[in-house]
Amino acid sequence: MKKNTDSEMDQRLGYKFLVPDPKAGVFYRPLHFQYVSYSNFILHRLHEILTVKRPLLSFKNNTERIMIEISNVKVTPPDYSPIIASIKGKSYDALATFTVNIFKEVMTKEGISITKISSYEGKDSHLIKIPLLIGYGNKNPLDTAKYLVPNVIGGVFINKQSVEKVGINLVEKITTWPKFRVVKPNSFTFSFSSVSPPNVLPTRYRHYKISLDISQLEASNISSTKTFITVNIVLLSQYLSRVSLEFIRRSLSYDMPPEVVYLVNAIIDSAKRITESITDFNIDTYINDLVEAEHIKQKSQLTINEFKYEMLHNFLPHMNYTPDQLKGFYMISLLRKFLYCIYHTSRYPDRDSMVCHRILTYGKYFETLAHDELENYIGNIRNDIMNNHKNRGTYAVNIHVLTTPGLNHAFSSLLSGKFKKSDGSYRTHPHYSWMQNISIPRSVGFYPDQVKISKMFSVRKYHPSQYLYFCSSDVPERGPQVGLVSQLSVLSSITNILTSEYLDLEKKICEYIRSYYKDDISYFETGFPITIENALVASLNPNMICDFVTDFRRRKRMGFFGNLEVGITLVRDHMNEIRINIGAGRLVRPFLVVDNGELMMDVCPELESRLDDMTFSDIQKEFPHVIEMVDIEQFTFSNVCESVQKFRMMSKDERKQYDLCDFPAEFRDGYVASSLVGINHNSGPRAILGCAQAKQAISCLSSDIRNKIDNGIHLMYPERPIVISKALETSKIAANCFGQHVTIALMSYKGINQEDGIIIKKQFIQRGGLDIVTAKKHQVEIPLENFNNKERDRSNAYSKLESNGLVRLNAFLESGDAMARNISSRTLEDDFARDNQISFDVSEKYTDMYKSRVERVQVELTDKVKVRVLTMKERRPILGDKFTTRTSQKGTVAYIADETELPYDENGITPDVIINSTSIFSRKTISMLIEVILTAAYSAKPYNNKGENRPVCFPSSNETSIDTYMQFAKQCYEHSNPKLSDEELSDKIFCEKILYDPETDKPYTSKVFFGPIYYLRLRHLTQDKATVRCRGKKTKLIRQANEGRKRGGGIKFGEMERDCLIAHGAANTITEVLKDSEEDYQDVYICENCGDIAAQIKSINTCLRCSKLNLSPLLTKIDTTHVSKVFLTQMNARGVKVKLDFERRPPSFYKPLDKVDLKPSFLV
C-alpha cells in the first residue's frame, strides 16, 4: 500500500509549516512571530528611537539654537538566567544606557560655534530597565547562549517578584482603509489616517475627514483639526495634481455605475460654481487665501511662508517624500472610493473588518511606549531649560531631569495591564495551565474603550474577514470579552520587518514597477493606482493589471524582492486599485497556489518523494510556486477554493477562476482547539465550551515551581495523550501533558450520577489519580517597629513562627496561623498604671480552609519588612471538584465509591469514573466515543509495523468519516488477536463489555460502553470556592462581612436573604441574624412628629428639625440594625428624606369586651 496518497499531500505540506524550521531560525512556530517582534525592538528599533539629534529651542530667526543629542545607546543583558531571577524574586530585565549632550549652536560669520551646556553619561544600573521576553528554551534575544530547556516554551516576561506576565495582541485603532460613515440621510463622511513611514522619527500622525452632503455639494470639503485648511476636495486635488476639472471628472467617472457618474458630474459642477463665483479665479491664490485665514485663526507664531510650508509639506505624512502631483492623484483615488461607497456600502471593507487593521505585537507595544516616553523626556528637558532661563537667566538642566527618562514606569505599567495610560492589554498568566502561554500571546483583541465609545462598532459578531485566519471555536462564550478576543489559527502569524529591510524592500518594488514602460505606469486618468503602504507610486494601464499581478506574485515567491510575506491585492469592483503591503502587523498564512487553473502542488512530481527530508523553508526555496504566504487583505480580494478535494471536482474552466486553495479543515483551528478531538463530529457549542475548559485544565509541573513564589496549580502525575493532532504535538502541548488516562463506563449508578454528576473510584484517588499540588503565594508588609516588637502574651496564632518572627519551613499552616510577627504597641497616658505599655496582634492570618506546608520564605528589609511565603498542598479529588473530557463533557464529583461498590468486567477491572450515559445524547458528543474507541485500539496495538510507538492522529477538525476510524480499530484488534469471532470483534471495536453487579455478582442485561479516555481536571476546586462563615472580619462602614474569598470574606446577609427566610416563616432567625447579635444591635431614637432620627448632643437626645421650630416632640426608642441607620443617614446627606412613621391604632384593652351569653344552647 502506498504510504501517502495525493489527497494527503496538502495535509503533509500544512504539517511542514507547524514543525520547527532551524534553517529559517524557527525553533518554536506558535510564538515565533512574537520572538521576532520583540528581538527587532530590542536589537534594532530601540537604538533608532533613542538616537536623537534635534533642536530644543531656537532664537533670533533660528541663528541660535539649543540642541540635544542622545548617542551611545547600549543594551546589556542580565548576568543570570530566568530561573535565577525566580530564585532571587527579581524581575528579568535588560539594562539600556545612553549619553545625553545638550549644547548651544550659534551661527556666526566664521561658521557655527558650539557651546556645551550640559551632558550626562548614563551608567546608572537603573536608567532604563527593559523587561526581557523569555523565548523558547529560556533564551532571550540578547544572549542566545543560555542553556536550552526544550519543554519550556517561553513567551513570558518575568516581572518584579518573579511573576510571569503575558499579554494579548491589540488591534490597532488606525485603519489602513478610510472609514465610511453615514452621518444622516444624504450626509456622509470618509475619514482616514496618515502615518509617516518607520524611517521617519518622531512618527507624525495626521487624521483627515472628507465630508459630503448631497444638499450642499459645494461644501464637499476635506479638513483636519489645526493641521490643515478646510477646502473643497475637488479643488484641492486640482491644486496638487495640476490637472483640469475635466480630467478629474473623467478619472472619477471611469468604470463607474451610472448612479455614481451622475453624482460625479454634480460634484464637479459644484466645484465649477465655486470657481465661477470668484472673479479672475486662480487656484493658487484661492489656496493661499485659505492658508492665510487659517494662519490668522490659529494665531501662529510662524511667518506665513513657514506656516504654509509646514501645512502643505506635512500633508499626508505617509507620502512624505512624494511630489505634490502624486498626492493630488491619491486624493482623486480616495474620492473615487468615497463616491462608490455611498451607493455600494456592502462591497467596501467596513471598519470592523480585519482587512482595515494592523495588529500590535509585543515589540510594537514597547516601541510605542519608547516613542511616547522619549518625547516626554525631551519635553521635560526643554521645559527645564526654559524655566532656568526665565528664573536665573542661564541655559541649564537639572541632573534629576536628565536621569529620569520615565521608561521604567511605562514598561512597569505595561506589564501591570496598562498600555498608553488607559488601555488594558496585559494580564497575569494563571498558572493552572501553561497552555495559556500559547493561547494568550496568539490572541487578538480590540481596545475595550474602542467598543464602548463607538456606537457603530459591531465586532462582537464573527466577522467574515476573520475566516481562515482566526479560530472560530476558541472565542469567549460569555462576559465582556465576547466577540472582542479571537485566537489565531495554527497557520496564521503576524508580520515583522526591520526599518532597513522596509526601505530596501520598498526600493526594490519601486524599481520593479519603474522597469515597465513609462506610459504604461502613468495612466493617472483611467488607470489602476499602485500603492505601497497606501503611498501612490504609479498608475497602471488597465490592460496590463492581470499580467502585472501574476508576474509580481511569481517574483515574490521566487525571492526576487527578498521578502516572501509581501501582500499584493488587486481591488476590482469599480474601485480599481493595486495595493502592495509590506509593513508589520499584517496577518499572513500560507495557501496552496493555483496558476492558470492548475494546482501547482500537482505539477511538481518530485515534491512527494522529497517532502519528508525538507523543511518549510526548503519547500519555499526549491518549489517556490507550490505555497504562497498571503496576507488577509490579499485573501479577501482573491478567489480561494475551500479544499483540494473540491478543487479537483471542478471543471477546467471553473478552476481557472481561482487564485489559491486552502489546506484541510484542521489547520483552521487554533492551538487550544487543536487539543480537542473531532469537534466537527459534535454539536457546535461543544467546540466553544471545550476550548474554554481546555484552558482551565490543570497541566504538569513547571520547571521551577519551588523557586518561583507565585500562585499555581500543577498536575502531579501527568500522562501524554494517546489521541492527538499534529498541532498538539508540534506545539509541545502533548509532550508537557494536561491530563491522565482513566477507564470510564457510560451507565447510571444508583441514581447518583444524574446530570453532571460523576462517580469516581476511591482506590483511583488513593493511587494518585488526577492528583494535584497547589502552590500559593502569601505576601505581607509589616512596619519595622511592629516586626521587632515582642509578644507580651503567648498567642496560638504565633505557634508556627521561629524566634526570628518568620514562619518555619515545612510547617503546616492552618486557618488562623500568622505568617510573620506583627505586634502593634501603644503607650497609655496613665501615671498610676504600673505597666502603661499595651500591645496587640495585628498580623495577617492564613485563611484557607485546608492545611498547607511552607515551602519557601523570602524577606526584604527596607522601611518595611516585606515577607513572601510559598505554601504547597497536595489535593486529591473530593466531592464537588470538576473534571472534563476533551469533548466538553464536564462532570462534578457526586460520590466517591469504594472498589467493592463498583461493577466489574470478566477480568475484575472496575471503572475509574462512571459518567451518565444520557450526556452523550443530550450534548451530541460523538467524538468522545470515537476517542475511547481509538484509545482502546491503541492499547491493542501500540506500535506500528516498524516497532515504533505511534500515537493516534485524530485532528480537532477533520474530514475523515467515522467508518474510517472503525476500520482502523478493527485492523488493530485483528492484528493482535486474529482468532476473534465477529461478535467479539464488534464488542472490542465499539468498547462494549458485560459488567457484573457488585452486590449480586450477576451480569447486567445490557452491555456497557467501557474503555479508556484522556481525562482533565479543572481548576474549579471546591475548597477554593467555599466562602461561608459565621464570624470573622467585617467592614467598618456597614459592619457586614467582607466581600471576596481572598480577604476572608463571608456571606453578606441582606434583603434577598431576608426574603428567603420570610418565605420559610423563620421570623426568629431573621431577628437573630439581622438584629440581635452584639455588633449589629443599634438603639435609635425616632421623632414621632417628623420621623427624623434624633441626634445626641451632650448626652441629650433631641430632634434637630423640631427643636429649630421650638417644638417638643415625643422621642421613641426603637432597636434596629446598624446598616439601616447608615442607610438613612446617607440618604439624608443626599437630600432624600426618609420618614419613619409609627402605626396608629388604639391598644386592644381600650376596646369594650363582647358580651358572652352563658345560657345553655337548648334554652335559647
Swiss-Prot record:
Belongs to the RNA polymerase beta chain family. Part of the DNA-dependent RNA polymerase which catalyzes the transcription of viral DNA into RNA using the four ribonucleoside triphosphates as substrates. Responsible for the transcription of early, intermediate and late genes. DNA-dependent RNA polymerase associates with the early transcription factor (ETF), itself composed of D6 and A7, thereby allowing the early genes transcription. Late transcription, and probably also intermediate transcription, require newly synthesized RNA polymerase. Keywords: DNA-directed RNA polymerase, Metal-binding, Nucleotidyltransferase, Transcription, Transferase, Virion. The DNA-dependent RNA polymerase used for intermediate and late genes expression consists of eight subunits (147) kDa, (133) kDa, (35) kDa, (30) kDa, (22) kDa, (19) kDa, (18) kDa and (7) kDa totalling more than 500 kDa in mass. The same holoenzyme, with the addition of the transcription-specificity factor RAP94, is used for early gene expression. It is an enzyme of class 2 (transferase). It catalyses: RNA(n) + a ribonucleoside 5'-triphosphate = RNA(n+1) + diphosphate. It is found in: Virion. Pfam families: RNA_pol_Rpb2_3, RNA_pol_Rpb2_5, RNA_pol_Rpb2_6, RNA_pol_Rpb2_7, rpo132. One of its GO terms (cellular component) is DNA-directed RNA polymerase complex. Its main location: virion. This is DNA-directed RNA polymerase 132 kDa polypeptide. GO terms for molecular function: DNA binding; DNA-directed RNA polymerase activity; metal ion binding; ribonucleoside binding. Its EC number is 2.7.7.6. GO terms for biological process: DNA-templated transcription. PANTHER family: DNA-DIRECTED RNA POLYMERASE I SUBUNIT 2.
